[in-house]
């Protein structure tokens, strides 16, 4: 089962999650579970070890936040502690931090948000976990999704503008398929 969790409550996230839920149900017949912070206690307790949990938020190499001003934000350790307190199963093996630059090093001596989150989760007893971070500006909204160039594949994919640190591109701001620019820890 796929779970989409937005750890900050706002109308933009709610509408994007609802759009994703309806789209996937129509296309695949499988309805993912989508929820926001105010529903997290209810839904995180349902996640099983084989499930995939997407954390959907605005972000940068330092943290994830609510909107572009990050007045309400979480560090990797704060996010890990929040999931632990909400009783996320320690059997989970796949969490994807779908936020901008979550897989890019913060600095030469400080690992990426995704790697620091994985380390925080390991310290809380999540031993089977693989965490995915993304290497650029990600797009979750279906309005900004792209299609693969293959004629037979009309699915709209999560998009990403790769960070210049990762990929030098002659076409500035060209959007690629997000799964092409991710890193796993």
Describe the residue ranges of each PLM region.
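Catalytic-core segments of thiol-dependent peptidases
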Residues: 2-106
